[in-house]
From Swiss-Prot:
Interacts with AFG3L2. Interacts with SPG7. Interacts with SMDT1/EMRE (via the N-terminal transit peptide); interaction is direct and takes place before maturation of SMDT1/EMRE. Promotes sorting of SMDT1/EMRE in mitochondria by ensuring its maturation. Interacts with the transit peptide region of SMDT1/EMRE precursor protein in the mitochondrial matrix, leading to protect it against protein degradation by YME1L1, thereby ensuring SMDT1/EMRE maturation by the mitochondrial processing peptidase (PMPCA and PMPCB). It is found in: Mitochondrion matrix. The keyword Mitochondrion applies. Disulfide bonds: none annotated. One of its GO terms (cellular component) is mitochondrial inner membrane. GO terms for biological process: calcium import into the mitochondrion; mitochondrial calcium ion homeostasis; protein insertion into mitochondrial inner membrane from matrix; protein insertion into mitochondrial membrane. The gene is Maip1. This is m-AAA protease-interacting protein 1, mitochondrial. Residues 1-96 form a transit peptide. The keyword Transit peptide applies. One of its GO terms (molecular function) is ribosome binding. Keywords: Mitochondrion, Transit peptide.
Length: 291
């Protein structure tokens, strides 16, 4: 019994009932016979010579009347392990250093919660369904919004660089002529503010959808898209009344000031039979820049 007390953890000892013996396994392959006859507190089976050996994960608490805790040890004293535990492989230890610095994030994303007019939201979904049902079976308002977002980033960059020749097939001719005059009168900082990087577009919304026929019977669909984007162009806040200003800090770098601007692009497509299925931009507006 003294040998078992040294090899087995204390919770494996059980209430003693005379007359039977059972085998208790230690953490090694050595088996010890003890004169114990009891009921397991977990499965309520009688532990006898015919019972299966107690698995290593089975725990039975000792009876309060039979506990023998021995001499008390300090709660924070050094733990002493049995010789059976010495043969077990040591678990890997991961060391930490107070000098290690966490990896710095290179980008900071801004999340803006936008709430559109519920009436307008329902209206645009109804018109989107009509476009799908009567004009284009492959039309999806979600896919169109994603494509419009990419087109906005591309066209706005060309506008800021005054590359109007590359916009001739993307923007309506009468609209492009007006844009040339407006962009030419802008300062360099205002031109830079026209460009919207696709990663700086923080919110996109469907403004309006219209379906109409002209006097020649041609079918047209217009979709107005609204975009909100951040720009780091150096623009005096007085010239952009109503614009929101944000300060963005990336890691340990200096604080960068960005302004939140908005733009509206109206996309148009003719669904007349035999016409090339291309979307063109029929209107471009940049709040406080191109109006």
């Amino acid at each position: 019994m003294a040998l078992a007390a040294r090899l087995l953890p204390l919770p494996l000892l059980s209430w003693s009932l005379p007359g039977r013996a059972t085998r208790l396994r230690t953490l090694r392959t050595t088996e010890v016979k003890l004169t114990l006859n009891e009921f397991c507190c977990l499965c309520r089976r009688r532990l006898g010579s015919s019972a299966a050996p107690i698995p290593r994960c089975t725990w039975a608490w000792a009876s309060p009347t039979m506990r023998s805790w021995g001499p008390r040890r300090p709660l924070l004293g050094r733990a002493e392990h049995s010789p059976a535990l010495a043969s077990l492989p040591a678990s890997p230890i991961r060391s930490y250093s107070t000098e290690e610095q966490p990896q710095q994030r290179q980008r900071t994303r801004m999340i803006i919660l936008g709430f559109s007019n519920p009436i307008n939201w329902v209206r645009t979904r109804i018109y989107a369904f009509l476009i799908w049902a009567y004009f284009d079976k492959e039309f999806s308002i979600a896919e169109f919004s994603e494509g419009a977002k990419q087109a906005f980033a591309y066209v706005s960059k060309l506008l800021s660089q005054c590359k109007f020749d590359l916009l001739e097939e993307l923007v309506a001719k009468e609209v492009l002529q007006v844009l040339k005059e407006k962009v030419a009168s802008l300062s360099d900082n205002h031109k830079n503010a026209l460009a919207a990087d696709i990663d700086d577009i923080v919110y996109t919304s469907t403004g309006d959808i219209s379906i109409y026929y002209d006097e020649k019977g041609r079918k047209f669909v217009n979709i107005l898209m609204c975009f909100w984007y951040l720009t780091s162009a150096n623009i005096p806040s007085e010239s952009l009344s109503g614009a929101n200003v944000f300060q963005v800090k990336l890691g340990d770098q200096s604080v960068e000031t960005k302004q939140l601007l908005s733009a509206s692009y109206e996309f148009q497509r003719e669904f007349t039979q035999g016409v090339k299925p291309d979307w063109t931009i029929a209107r471009i507006e940049h709040s406080k820049l191109l109006e």
